[in-house]
Amino acid sequence: MQATDQSNAVAYRGTGRRKSSIVRVRLVPGSGVMTINGKPGDLYLQFNPSYIANAKAPLESLGLENDYDVLVNARGGGLTGQADAIKLGVARALCELDPENRKPLKLEGYLTRDPRAKERKKYGLRKARKAPQYSKR
């Protein structure tokens, strides 16, 4: 969905989810700055190179990392889930920016939602699958 930002610049939106993290991403023409919940992206992702690379991967695969500012609102989960959700949200926003981007992003796997989530704990068990020790006699 295309919307105008406060500065009358066009913003492209995308939503990403992973585990229990939900992320809303806005791409605005700019210089490549990533802001997550009002903090610089590097600081929010604790300067972890894998988280940062993961979040910026769709932009880098298209060579647009210095053309758009990424504004992120992230809720829930931990840093791993949020970084993966940002990746999906950025990829979806890039598809909205130009439908031609869809094919290369799909081939790289950036548009695939990872369905893995924490399995619920079952009654009678200690965890989701761990059973109490069984004694035959």
Curated annotation (Swiss-Prot):
GO molecular function term, any single one: structural constituent of ribosome
UniProtKB keywords: Ribonucleoprotein, Ribosomal protein
Residue span of region Disordered: 118-137
Gene Ontology cellular component list: cytosolic small ribosomal subunit
GO biological process, one term: translation
Superkingdom, taxonomy of origin: Bacteria
Family: Belongs to the universal ribosomal protein uS9 family.
Annotated protein name in UniProt: Small ribosomal subunit protein uS9
Organism of origin: Acaryochloris marina (strain MBIC 11017)
